Amino acid sequence: MTNLNYQQTHFVMSAPDIRHLPSDTGIEVAFAGRSNAGKSSALNTLTNQKSLARTSKTPGRTQLINLFEVADGKRLVDLPGYGYAEVPEEMKRKWQRALGEYLEKRQSLQGLVVLMDIRHPLKDLDQQMIEWAVDSNIAVLVLLTKADKLASGARKAQLNMVREAVLAFNGDVQVETFSSLKKQGVDKLRQKLDTWFSEMQPVEETQDGE
């Protein structure tokens, strides 16, 4: 297993939907979460960069798929935040279509990190993201963010509750606590990413039956 240097991660491009992404080769790991789950902060903590992923005081502002390259052919994908109440319904549907299309069709997608506020985990859209991933045979790491907001006992109780709940998905779903502020859970996140980035990809199909 390769230990990648996530501090070398750099922004590549933004895309409004899957059709505007670069060629479907290499390995991608996607980050998804509700608009206030701390996704941008987690990416910045992972890479030890203060502004790699733009954090916003306005939830729902990140409407694009953002790609970051860790190493040649190895990318992190920041998916649009979902579930923000004040976003118009039409825009919500558009985001959900883009998310579902990416999870179902992107061949280079190796793993999905779903971030949830530890105080409010497993909302409907969180569960839908996990379900989409499991249905597409994609491994999932659930990060219960803002873990520093709870005392140790409450933190463990939430962790155990979510671990029990995700068994119902019958998929490869791991759950860990995470705090960008305290740098808690960063090592486990890096270990999981290293594993996913080290896995062999299936041989690409040739065109025209060649």
Curated annotation (Swiss-Prot):
SUPFAM superfamilies: P-loop containing nucleoside triphosphate hydrolases. Its cofactor is Mg(2+). Residues 25-199 form the EngB-type G domain. One of its GO terms (molecular function) is metal ion binding. CDD domains: YihA_EngB. Coiled coil: none annotated. GO terms for biological process: division septum assembly. Keywords: Cell cycle, Cell division, GTP-binding, Magnesium, Metal-binding, Nucleotide-binding, Septation. Transmembrane segments: none annotated. InterPro entries: G_ENGB_dom (IPR030393), GTP-bd (IPR006073), GTP-bd_ribosome_bio_YsxC (IPR019987), P-loop_NTPase (IPR027417). It comes from the Bacteria. GO terms for cellular component: cytosol. Mg(2+) binds at S40, T62. HAMAP family: GTPase_EngB. Belongs to the TRAFAC class TrmE-Era-EngA-EngB-Septin-like GTPase superfamily. EngB GTPase family. Necessary for normal cell division and for the maintenance of normal septation. Depletion of this protein leads to a severe reduction in growth rate and to extensive filamentation, with a block beyond the stage of segregation. Essential for bacteria survival. This is Probable GTP-binding protein EngB. It comes from Escherichia coli (strain K12). The gene is engB.
